[in-house]
Swiss-Prot record:
Organism encoding this protein: Bordetella bronchiseptica (strain ATCC BAA-588 / NCTC 13252 / RB50) (Alcaligenes bronchisepticus)
N-terminal signal peptide: 1-30
Topological region Periplasmic: 332-541
Entry protein name: Virulence sensor protein BvgS
Chain ranges on the Cytoplasmic side, renumbered to this chain: 33-307, 564-1238
Gene Ontology MF, one: histidine phosphotransfer kinase activity
Reactions the enzyme catalyzes: ATP + protein L-histidine = ADP + protein N-phospho-L-histidine
Stretches assigned to the HPt domain: 1133-1228
Biological-process GO terms, alphabetical: regulation of DNA-templated transcription
Pfam families: HATPase_c, HisKA, Hpt, PAS, Response_reg, SBP_bac_3
C-alpha cells in the first residue's frame, strides 16, 4: 500500500486535471453557441396548470428558461434562419414560456454533444427534440412527449417490392443524430448502416440510388418528402423500433423544472396539438383559412397608399417563377403571391427580367417594389431585405448520364462546375474543391445546357429546380447524381433596403400561411409531367387491368350479341325486308364507282349514287327504263348500241366479263374498265345483268405520261452518248495534231532547227482545244442557270469596231472583203455586257468568214432610240455557200455542223458557237434569226432592246481603257507574290521581274500577311490553296485591315491564283474580297494585260512593257509535256529554265513522298490537298497525264471515308508519272546548251 504522503499529491493532481477538463468542457460550448430569437405560433394559447406556491416563486426567481438546440436542423421540429428559431419544438417552447410567465432564450450549438454538455454544465435548462432512446443513452430526464416519434422506412418510388422485414442485404441510410448504432444493429443486424449528417441527405441518398432504405421519424420524413422528394420516394412500412416520442430533456437532478414543463404540456388540449401539427404541413388536409393578420396602423396606411405592388421575377427560374406559352405567370412564387394577395389585399404587378443583376437593379432603382423569388445570401442582404423563406431546399449535383461523369460530391474536385452567376454557393464550392473550375451562366437553364453540351461536368442546383429541369427538359441526358453537403438554399421575397413596412407586411402574411399550404404548393410544382419509370414499375398491373378490361368488353359484347339474337328471333319476319334493303343500299351506294342492275329486258332495276352523279340525272329518270328510253348518254345511236350490247351479253354468255373501253359521254371521251355479270334465280333462270365500271382515264393518262417520260429519258441518254462521242472526237482531233507534231519535234536531232510550221500547227490545235473547253463551260453554265451577265456602260460603236479589228487579218488572208456599216442615230452609250456581245459578234463574223471563199462579209449595225431604250440590230451577211432549210433547223443545236460545200469538205470547229450565241442573245432579252439559201449566202440578225445611258465624258469602254492606259506614266508596281509551291512561286516572280515589277515573294499566308502589314503593295497575287492561312483567308484579313478606322494606305489590287477549273472559282475569289482570279498556267502577255487592267481600275501607274522583245505566250499549252510551253513561260531564259525545272523536280519528289505517307495514314483530306498541289506543279510544264491523274485523285479523295483500291492505283500512277516526268525533263535539259547564271 502506497504511503499517504505520496497519495496526497497524486490525488491533488488528478483533481486539478478533472477541474480543468470540466472548465474546458463548459467553456467550449459557451464559445460555440449562438443565440437565436424564438419565433413561435402567433397566437399562443392560455392553459390551466396546477402548480404550488413554491413552483411559482421558483419561476419568478428563474425569469428565463434557456432552450438548447443544435445543428443540423431537424425540420419541422427545428428550423433556423436569419438568427431565428422556429418549428414544432419552438411552438411548444413558446407555449411553455407564456404559461409559466418566463422569458424563453434559445442557444444553438454546432453539435448535439455540445448541446448536451451545455445542459450538464448548467448553461441551458432544457434541450428539445429528444426521443426516449436518446434520453436513456444520455442519462437525461424526459418530459412527457409533445409529438409522436414513429420510425418509418422509405424507399424509392420505382422500387417494385417492399424490403424484407429484417432489411437483410439492404443499405440503410440514417441521420447520425437520430438513432444510435446499437439500436439499429439490434433491430436490423443484417443491414449495412450508412450515416449522414442530416435526415435530408440520408433521404437524398435513397432518392438518387446511393442507399436502398431510409429510416426516420414519421413527422420529419413526411415534411422532407413533401418539400423535396415527393416524386422520388415513398413510405413503405413502419420500422421495428419504438422510441417513445419527442420530448424536452432536462438534467436528471432538475425535477422541479421537469414537473412544471410536464404540467404545461399535459394541459395543452388535443385541438391545439392538432393545430400545431397542421401548421407545419403534417395534417391530413390543407387549411383554407385566409384571414388577414393584424397589421399595424403604419402598415395599413402603406397598403392604402400602394394598392399596386410591382414584383420583379426571373423569366427562367423554374419551378419558382416561369411564364407559360400563353404569357401567364406561374410557378411556386405565383401561388405564394396569390395567397399573399388574399391576406393583404394588394394587387401584384409582375415584371419579368432575364438576370439576377437586372432584378436587383430594378429593386434599387425603384422600378420594382419587391422580388418574387430570390436566393438568400449574405452578399445580397447588404443591399436587400429578405422576408421569411417560403421554401428551404437542399443542394444537389446534376451530371450527364455518362459513366465518366462525377458519381457524387467526392468526385467534383478537378472538374468543371456550372453555377448561376453570383450564387452564394460559389465561394463554398471553391473553398471545398480548390481544383475545380467554376463557370457561370445567367440562369439555371443555361447552366443545365452547359452540362448537357459537354462544356461542364456538373451543375449545382436546388433539388426542386434540378428535378424540374431534368424531368421536363433533359430526360435521358442529365441525372441528379447526389446531394451536396451545403447549407440548404432559402427562397424568399425581397425588397430594397428601407422598405420597412412592406417587408413587415410580407412577413406577417407569410407567417399566416401554414406550412401545410406551402408544402402543397411545392408538391404541385415538383417533378415531371409523368415518371418514365411508372410503366416499368407497374407494367404487370397495367397488363392485368388491360386484360380485365378486354375480358369485360368481350363479355359485354357477347351479352349484346345474345340480346340482339333474341330480338332478331322475335322480329325476324318484321325486319327481314328492311335488312335486305339496307344491305343493298350500303352495298350499292357505298361503292364509289358506278353500279347498275338491269332485268333481262334491259330495264333499270337499281343503281347507285355514283351512277346518277356520272350522268347528272335523278333516280326517277332512269329506274324502270332502258338505255334508249332514258338516253342518259346524250346520243340516241350510242344508247341503242349500248342497249343491244347488254341484250347480246345476257343471251350469249353467262360468265363475268371484264374489258377496257373508250366511251364518249356528253362530248368527252373517257377510258373505263367495264365489268358485267349476268345473274339468275335459285333455279338458274336468267333474271338480268349486274354491271359497272371504273373510270381509269387518269391512270391511262399517267401511263402515257410515264411512257413519254421514258422516251424523253432514253432520248436524254442518247444525247449524252452523242455528246460524249462528239467530245471524244473534238478533243482527239486537235490532240492528234498536238501530239503528232510534238512527237516529230522531239524526234528531230537536238542541233536541228525546230520546224516552225509544226509548232504553229500544234499551237493552233491547242488554241482550238482551249476554245472548245471554254464553249463547253459556257454551255454548262447556261444550262445550269448559273450564267450571269455583267451589263456596264458601253459605247455602242466600239462593239462592232472591235470585232472587225480582230478578224480583219483573217479576212485578208482568205482574200475576202470585211466591211462595217453603221446606221446609228441618237444612240451613244448603252447598258450591255460588252464581253458577251463581242463573243456573239465574233462567232457570227468568224462563221461568215469560215464559210465564205470569195466575195465579202458585211457587219451592219442599226440603232434608233425607242423611248428610254434603244432598238439595236446587228446583222452579219456573207456571200458564202448558203445553208438549206433542213440544215438551219439543226444548226442551233450543240455540236451540230453543216458542210460549206462539197469542195470544202467538213467545216472545222465544234458546232457550239451558234448555240451559245443564240442563248446569250436570249439571256440579253433579244432574238437571233438566220436567213439563208444554198448558193445565195447567209444573213444572221441580232435584235436587242437596250437601255440607253446618258453620255459621259468619262465613259470609256473597257477595251479603250486598257488601250489608253499606256499613256500614263511608266512606273512599275509593288507586287506581293504568295505561293507555297516553290516552282510556281519562282516562275511567277521571274515573269513579274521580266515585266519590270518590284516583286516581294512569300511562301505562306502567314509570311505574306506579315509583309503586307510592314510594307505597302499595289498588287497582291496569292495562291488560293495553301496550308495554314490560304488565299481566301488572306484576302479576307487584308480587306478587313483596309476597312479598319485609321487605315491610311491605298486599297491594293488582289488577285487569286489557282489551278482549279471549277466554274465557281472566280466567284469564290470575289466573295473572299479579291478583285479577280488568275488561272495557272499564265503567260507573260496575259499577265501584263491583267496588270494593265488592274492598274486602270485602281488608277495605279501602268506597268511598263519590257524593253526587250518577247515571244508571244499563251495561258495554256495542252500537251503531255511541252518544251514550247516552258520556253514561252520563261521567255527562253536559259538560266531561268534550269532553275525552274530543278526546283520543280525537287518539289515534286518531296510532294510525292508526302502524298505516299498521307495515303498510308488514310488522311484523305490532306491527300486531296497534296494532289491539288501536284496538279499545280504539273501545269507549269503542261504534264497533262499527270494533271489528269492528280485532279482525279483530288476529287476522289475529297469524299472518301475508308480504304479505296481506286485511290491506291491513282497514287501509284501519280508517283510513276512524276518519276517519268523527271526523267523526260532531265533528258530535255541535257539536250540544251549550258549557260551561266545571269
Amino acid at each position: 500500500m502506497p504511503a499517504p504522503h505520496r497519495l496526497y499529491p497524486r490525488s491533488l493532481i488528478c483533481l486539478a486535471q478533472a477541474l480543468l477538463a470540466w472548465a474546458l468542457l463548459a467553456w467550449a460550448p459557451a464559445q460555440a453557441s449562438q443565440e437565436l430569437t424564438l419565433v413561435g405560433k402567433a397566437a399562443v394559447p392560455d392553459v390551466e396548470i396546477a402548480l404550488d406556491g413554491d413552483d411559482w416563486r421558483w419561476l419568478a426567481r428563474k425569469r428565463v428558461l434557456t432552450l438548447g438546440v443544435y445543428a443540423p436542423d431537424i425540420p419541422p421540429f427545428d428550423v433556423t434562419y436569419d438568427e431565428r428559431y422556429e418549428g414544432l419544438t419552438a411552438d411548444y417552447m413558446a407555449i411553455i414560456a407564456h404559461n409559466l410567465g418566463v422569458q424563453a432564450k434559445v442557444l444553438r450549438y454546432p453539435t448535439r454533444e455540445q448541446a448536451v454538455g451545455a445542459l450538464e454544465s448548467g448553461q441551458i435548462d432544457l434541450i428539445g427534440t429528444v426521443n426516449g432512446i436518446e434520453g436513456r443513452l444520455q442519462s437525461l430526464r424526459l418530459s412527457v412527449p409533445y409529438a409522436a416519434d414513429h420510425p418509418v422506412l422509405v424507399m424509392p418510388i420505382g422500387a417494385r417490392r417492399a424490403p424484407p422485414a429484417d432489411l437483410a442485404g439492404q443499405r440503410l441510410a440514417v441521420d447520425a443524430n437520430y438513432l444510435p448504432r446499437e439500436t439499429l444493429q439490434q433491430a436490423y443486424p443484417q443491414a449495412t448502416l450508412h450515416y449522414f449528417p442530416s435526415s435530408e441527405q440520408a433521404l437524398a441518398a435513397v432518392a438518387y440510388g446511393q442507399a436502398d432504405v431510409f429510416i426516420g421519424d414519421a413527422l420529419t420524413t413526411s415534411h422532407l418528402v413533401s418539400q423535396s422528394y415527393f416524386n422520388d420516394v415513398r413510405v413503405v412500412a413502419p420500422a421495428q423500433i419504438v422510441t417513445g416520442g419527442e420530448s424536452f430533456g432536462v438534467r436528471a437532478d432538475n425535477t422541479r423544472l421537469l414537473r412544471v414543463v410536464n404540467a404545461v404540456l399535459e394541459a395543452i388540449p388535443a385541438s391545439e396539438r392538432r393545430s400545431l401539427i397542421y401548421r407545419w404541413g403534417l395534417g391530413s388536409s390543407i387549411s383554407l383559412d385566409f384571414a388577414r393578420p393584424a397589421y399595424s396602423a403604419r402598415e395599413q396606411q402603406w397598403m392604402a397608399n400602394h394598392p399596386v405592388v410591382k414584383v420583379a421575377v426571373l423569366n427562367l427560374f423554374a419551378p419558382f417563377t416561369l411564364f407559360r406559352t400563353d404569357e401567364q405567370f406561374g410557378g411556386i412564387s405565383a401561388a405564394v403571391l396569390q395567397l399573399l394577395q388574399l391576406r393583404t389585399g394588394l394587387d401584384f404587378q409582375i415584371i419579368g427580367v432575364d438576370t439576377v443583376e437586372e432584378l436587383i437593379a430594378k429593386l434599387r432603382s425603384g422600378e420594382a417594389d419587391m422580388a418574387g423569388a430570390l436566393f438568400v445570401n449574405a452578399a445580397r442582404e447588404s443591399v436587400l431585405s429578405f422576408s421569411r423563406p417560403y421554401v428551404r431546399n437542399g443542394m444537389v449535383i446534376v451530371t450527364r448520364q455518362d459513366p465518366a461523369a462525377p458519381a457524387d460530391a467526392d468526385h467534383l474536385d478537378g472538374r468543371t462546375i456550372a453555377m448561376v452567376r453570383n450564387s452564394a454557393a460559389i465561394p463554398l464550392l471553391q473553398q471545398r474543391y480548390p481544383q475545380a473550375k467554376v463557370v457561370t451562366a445567367d440562369n439555371p437553364t443555361e447552366a443545365m445546357l452547359l452540362v448537357a453540351d459537354g462544356q461542364a461536368d456538373a451543375v449545382v442546383q436546388t433539388q426542386i429546380s434540378a428535378s424540374y429541369y431534368v424531368n421536363r427538359y433533359f430526360a435521358g441526358k442529365l441525372r441528379i447524381a447526389s446531394a451536396l453537403d451545403l447549407p440548404p438554399a432559402e427562397i424568399a421575397l425581397a425588397t430594397a433596403r428601407g422598405q420597412t413596412e412592406l417587408i413587415s407586411i410580407l412577413n406577417k402574411a407569410l407567417y399566416s400561411i401554414s406550412n401545410d399550404e406551402l408544402a402543397s404548393i411545392v408538391s404541385r410544382w415538383r417533378g415531371s409531367d409523368g415518371d418514365p419509370r411508372t410503366w416499368y414499375a407497374y407494367r404487370n398491373e397495367i397488363y392485368l387491368l388491360i386484360g380485365l378490361g378486354l375480358l369485360s368488353a368481350l363479355l359485354f359484347l357477347s351479352w349484346i350479341v345474345y340480346l340482339r339474337r333474341q330480338i332478331r328471333q322475335r322480329k325476324r319476319a318484321e325486319r327481314a325486308l328492311n335488312d335486305q334493303l339496307e344491305f343493298m343500299r350500303v352495298l350499292i351506294d357505298g361503292t364509289p364507282n358506278p353500279i347498275y342492275v338491269r332485268d333481262k329486258e334491259g330495264r333499270m332495276l337499281l343503281c347507285n349514287d355514283a351512277y346518277l352523279d356520272t350522268f347528272g340525272v335523278t333516280a326517277d329518270a332512269v329506274l324502270g327504263k332502258t338505255i334508249p328510253e332514258a338516253n342518259v348518254v346524250g346520243d340516241p345511236a350510242l344508247a341503242r348500241e349500248m342497249h343491244e350490247f347488254l341484250l347480246t351479253r345476257m343471251s350469249a354468255e353467262r360468265e363475268p366479263r371484264f374489258e377496257d373501253r373508250d366511251v364518249t359521254l356528253h362530248g368527252r371521251t373517257r377510258h373505263v374498265y367495264q365489268w358485267t355479270v349476268p345473274y339468275g334465280d335459285s333455279l338458274g333462270e336468267l333474271k338480268g345483268i349486274i354491271g359497272g365500271w371504273i373510270d381509269i382515264t387518269e391512270r391511262a393518262e399517267l401511263l402515257r405520261e410515264l411512257h413519254d417520260a421514258k422516251e424523253s429519258a432514253d432520248a436524254a441518254n442518247r444525247a449524252k452518248t452523242t455528246f460524249l462521242a462528239t467530245m471524244s472526237h473534238e478533243i482527239r482531233t486537235p490532240m492528234n495534231a498536238i501530239i503528232g507534231m510534238l512527237e516529230l519535234a522531239l524526234l528531230r536531232p537536238a542541233d536541228q532547227e525546230p520546224d516552225r510550221q509544226s509548232i504553229q500547227v500544234a499551237y493552233d490545235s491547242a488554241r482550238s482545244l482551249l476554245e472548245l473547253i471554254g464553249d463547253i463551260l459556257d454551255i454548262a453554265k447556261i444550262e445550269a442557270g448559273k450564267f450571269d451577265l455583267a451589263p456596264v456602260r458601253t459605247a455602242l460603236r466600239a462593239l462592232p469596231e472591235g470585232a472587225i479589228r480582230v478578224f480583219d487579218g483573217l479576212a485578208r488572208q482568205k482574200g475576202i472583203e470585211l466591211v462595217l456599216k453603221t446606221d446609228i442615230v441618237g444612240v451613244d452609250d448603252v447598258l450591255i455586257d460588252p464581253l458577251r456581245m463581242k463573243q456573239v459578234l465574233s462567232n457570227l463574223v468568224g462563221n461568215a468568214i469560215k464559210f465564205t471563199t470569195e466575195g465579202q462579209v458585211v457587219l451592219t449595225v442599226t440603232a434608233r432610240p425607242d423611248g428610254e431604250a434603244a432598238h439595236v440590230q446587228f446583222s452579219v451577211s456573207d456571200t458564202g455557200c448558203g445553208i438549206s432549210e433542213a440544215d438551219q433547223r439543226q444548226l442551233f443545236k450543240p455540236f451540230s455542223q453543216v458542210g460549206g460545200s462539197a469542195e470544202a469538205g467538213p467545216a472545222p470547229g465544234t458546232g457550239l458557237g451558234l448555240s451559245i450565241s443564240r442563248r446569250l442573245v436570249e439571256l440579253m432579252g433579244g432574238t437571233l434569226v438566220m436567213r439563208s439559201a444554198p448558193g445565195v449566202g447567209t444573213t444572221v440578225s441580232v435584235d436587242l432592246r437596250l437601255t440607253m445611258v446618258e453620255k459621259s465624258a468619262q465613259a470609256t469602254p473597257p477595251a479603250a481603257a486598257a488601250q489608253a492606259t499606256p499613256s500614263k506614266p511608266q512606273v512599275s508596281l509593288r507586287v506581293l507574290v504568295v505561293d507555297d509551291h516553290k516552282p510556281n512561286l519562282m516562275l511567277l516572280r521571274q515573269q513579274l521581274d521580266y515585266l519590270g515589277q518590284r516583286v516581294v515573294a512569300a511562301d505562306s499566308g502567314e509570311a505574306a500577311l506579315a509583309l503586307w502589314h510592314e510594307h505597302a503593295f499595289d498588287v497582291v497575287i496569292t495562291d488560293c490553296n495553301m496550308p495554314g492561312i490560304n488565299g481566301y483567308e488572306l484576302a479576307r484579313r487584308i480587306r478587313a485591315a483596309e476597312a479598319a478606322p485609321g487605315y491610311g494606305r491605298t486599297r491594293c489590287i488582289l488577285f487569286g491564283f489557282t489551278a482549279s477549273a471549277q466554274m465557281d472559282e472566280a466567284q469564290r475569289c470575289r466573295a473572299a474580297g479579291m478583285d479577280d482570279c488568275l488561272f495557272k498556267p499564265i503567260g507573260v502577255d496575259a499577265l501584263r494585260q491583267r496588270l494593265n487592267e488592274a492598274a486602270a481600275r485602281a488608277a495605279l501607274p501602268t506597268p511598263p512593257s519590257p524593253q526587250a522583245a518577247a515571244p508571244a505566250t499563251h495561258d495554256a499549252t495542252p500537251a503531255a509535256f511541252s518544251a514550247e510551253s516552258i520556253l514561252a513561260l520563261t521567255q527562253n531564259d536559259e538560266a531561268l529554265i534550269r532553275q525552274l525545272l530543278e526546283e520543280l523536280i525537287r518539289t515534286n519528289r518531296a510532294d510525292v513522298d508526302q502524298l505516299q505517307k498521307l495515303h498510308q495514314q488514310a488522311d484523305w483530306p490532306k491527300v486531296s490537298d497534296m494532289a491539288h498541289r501536284l496538279a499545280g506543279g504539273a501545269r507549269v510544264v503542261d504534264a497533262k497525264a499527270m494533271i489528269d491523274t492528280a485532279l482525279a485523285l483530288e476529287k476522289k479523295a475529297q469524299g472518301q471515308a475508308g480504304p479505296s483500291p481506286e485511290i491506291d492505283g491513282m497514287v501509284r500512277t501519280l508517283a510513276a508519272q512524276s518519276a517519268a516526268l523527271e526523267t523526260q525533263l532531265r533528258a530535255w535539259l541535257e539536250q540544251r546548251p549550258h549557260q551561266g547564271q545571269p
